[in-house]
Design a protein with these regions (language model features):
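Active-site-adjacent substrate-binding region
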Residues: 176-320
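Short acidic, glycine/serine/threonine-rich loops at helix termini
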Residues: 93, 139-146, 182-185, 266
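Alpha-helical metal-binding/catalytic segments enriched in His/Glu/Asp
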Residues: 81, 91-132
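A glycine-rich helix N-cap at a beta->alpha junction
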Residues: 146-171
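Conserved active-site and cofactor/substrate-binding residues in soluble primary-metabolism enzymes
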Residues: 28-32, 54-57, 76, 102-105, ...
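Acidic, glycine-rich active-site loops and adjacent beta-strand->loop/helix elements
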Residues: 85-88, 132-139, 177
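Soluble metallo-hydrolase cores and metallopeptidase-like ectodomains found primarily
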Residues: 14-91
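Solvent-exposed alpha-helices and their adjacent loops that cap or buttress functional pockets
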Residues: 53-55, 68-75, 98-100, 120-124, ...
Length: 322
């Protein structure tokens, strides 16, 4: 193993491997993942199956309560971690776990680690809510050389099930490899998006990224199109910022990336080093944010923008009929 791997495969690699073994199955269900997490320790876990024609998906929500979190009657901030994807598999067109599943893999690995930490006495100050979906038989769109990934549910349903009103800030983790915009193996973060405004990069989040990777932070820019809802007829790089259309909380996209474009339905394209690094970053953000030591945006500056230029929340809607 190279020095690169020796230095970076640590903290969450066990959880990543365990979760991957669960997800890499044509028969995996939300109930199976729930049982796995419950065996780790205390957490409030709910699973909801939604059927759409011949396809279905299991949405899973994990609430890991903090010692001073809202669920305990406290006042510490609540972080949301959303694992975004169309599906973890594209069967029968493609055999096995697909690259698009890395958002779920990251989010569930973080949940497993936080539950284990709590069992061992390391309890975060505030609550963490982890949401994702599991669909091993996601629909695809015919395309050469490989089919595109689809989803058994529409974006409105996905947002309704994965964006919880208790989330006071959200990390949206999504495989973002099928483009020529981000050209690095690992992960990259977006600017903060809040109520139609694309704000500057959070210096606190950049600091966490530098500390956990030991490297200069990688970022990617988002467009106005990316922060509008799916289905409005304009181009979106992917669904990574779609949670921002369904909440007033600040959202940061966390993109799992590669140097070269890779299709979401590609198999054998998930890199454990990159997934672990992304998950570890999200866990450290959870520690800092729920302790009140990490901000996603400058509140005073945001209010100044709204006073000077007005609200931009219309960008969270489908827009005018034309």
């Amino acid at each position: 193993m190279s020095n690169y791997c020796d230095r970076r495969i640590n903290m969450l690699i066990k959880q990543v491997m365990e979760v991957f073994d669960l997800l890499d199955s044509a028969y995996v269900s939300g109930g199976e993942v729930k049982n796995y997490l419950q065996n780790k320790g205390d957490a409030d876990i709910t699973v909801k199956t939604i059927q759409d024609g011949t396809h279905s998906t299991d949405f899973i929500k994990i609430v890991i309560s903090g010692k001073n979190g809202k669920t305990a009657g406290g006042s510490a901030p609540t972080l949301g971690i959303v694992g975004r994807l169309g599906g973890i598999g594209a069967r029968p067109e493609v055999t096995g776990y697909v690259s698009d599943g890395d958002g779920a893999l990251c989010a569930l690995a973080v949940a497993a680690k936080l539950i284990e930490m709590k069992t061992k006495g390391d309890v975060l100050e505030g609550d963490v809510i982890v949401c994702t979906q599991l669909c091993p038989h996601a629909p695809t769109q015919p395309h050469e050389p490989v089919p595109f990934m689809g989803s058994p549910v529409d974006m409105a349903t996905m947002n309704r099930e994965e964006v919880d009103e208790a989330m006071e800030a959200i990390l949206s983790i999504d495989t973002t490899k099928g483009n020529s915009i981000i050209n690095v193996n690992g992960f990259a973060i977006s600017q903060t998006v809040k109520e139609g405004y694309i704000l500057r990069y959070s210096s606190d989040i950049l600091d966490v990224m530098q500390r956990t990777t030991g490297k200069a932070p990688h970022t990617f820019g988002v467009s106005m199109q990316d922060i509008t809802p799916y289905g409005n007829g304009v181009y979106h790089v992917n669904s990574i910022l779609q949670p921002a259309t369904a909440t007033g909380a600040p959202v940061i996209g966390v993109a799992v990336t590669t140097e070269q474009p890779v299709a979401g339905c590609a198999t054998g394209a998930s890199h454990f080093v990159d997934v672990e690094e992304t998950a570890r970053f999200a866990m450290e953000v959870a520690k800092a944010f729920t302790a009140g030591k990490c901000s996603f945006y400058d509140q005073a500056e945001f209010h100044l923008l709204e006073k000077k230029y007005g609200k931009m929340s219309h960008l969270q809607t489908m827009g005018a009929d034309i």
